[in-house]
């Protein structure tokens, strides 16, 4: 049940942070950005026959969508360092770069699966509770699907010189970053930082070819 709720919520998480090129010309308010882009991306998914058909072509299209529209709007360094937690300080510069790359690849897989699984969920966009001068806000969305309880998504976002960036996503109150931190702590305890990197590489290499063949896009500062 929890896995199903996470999948439903991740659909909205993936869609809401995919920013179209036109939106990048100006800094849009975070709640407006989430609403506008969620509706636009969902409309694309509904109308794309290749995506609706599923299979390898759909997966490749999802990867391209994620790399061009979603990845640039994450603050991956903040997400990775927070997910690795206290062990981040144990990593050297090369290890930090590799951790960042593997974590991006892991999220590509997560969002590819979620977007492919989209099936007419509805979205309730909650009013933003923040001051105009705030540079760190939380945008709230509820995902609604017939026959299930609504799932709440909280996007923790920070204002950067190039616009608003997501640094954590909380699904039904569960932090994506904190959830990975627990797993990563165990891996570092058992095999050190290199053990964590190897575990991430193994997990990412197990992806099907459509997802593994395309590397994660570079982080946009």
Regions found by a protein language model. Name each.
Residues 53-54, 123, 196-197:
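Short, hydrophobic secondary-structure boundary micro-motifs
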Residues 27-107, 111:
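Early exported N-terminus immediately downstream of N-terminal targeting peptides
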């Amino acid at each position: 049940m929890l896995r199903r709720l996470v999948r439903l919520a991740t659909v909205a998480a993936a869609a809401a942070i995919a920013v179209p090129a036109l939106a990048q010309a100006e800094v849009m308010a975070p709640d407006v950005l989430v609403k506008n882009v969620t509706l636009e991306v969902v409309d694309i998914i509904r109308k794309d026959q290749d995506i609706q058909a599923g299979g390898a072509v759909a997966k490749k299209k999802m990867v391209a969508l994620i790399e061009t529209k979603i990845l640039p709007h994450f603050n991956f360094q903040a997400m990775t360092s927070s997910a690795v937690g206290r062990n981040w300080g144990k990593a050297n510069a090369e290890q930090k770069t590799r951790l960042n790359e593997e974590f991006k690849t892991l999220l590509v897989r997560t969002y590819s699966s979620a977007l492919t699984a989209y099936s007419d969920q509805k979205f309730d966009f909650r009013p933003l509770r923040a001051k105009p001068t705030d540079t760190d806000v939380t945008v709230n969305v509820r995902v609604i699907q017939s026959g299930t309880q609504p799932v709440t998504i909280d996007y923790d976002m920070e204002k950067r010189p190039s616009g608003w960036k997501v640094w954590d996503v909380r699904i039904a109150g569960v932090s994506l970053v904190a959830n990975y931190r627990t797993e990563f702590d165990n891996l570092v305890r058992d095999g050190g930082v290199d053990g964590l990197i190897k575990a991430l590489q193994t997990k990412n290499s197990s992806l099907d070819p459509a997802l593994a063949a395309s590397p994660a896009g570079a982080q946009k500062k």
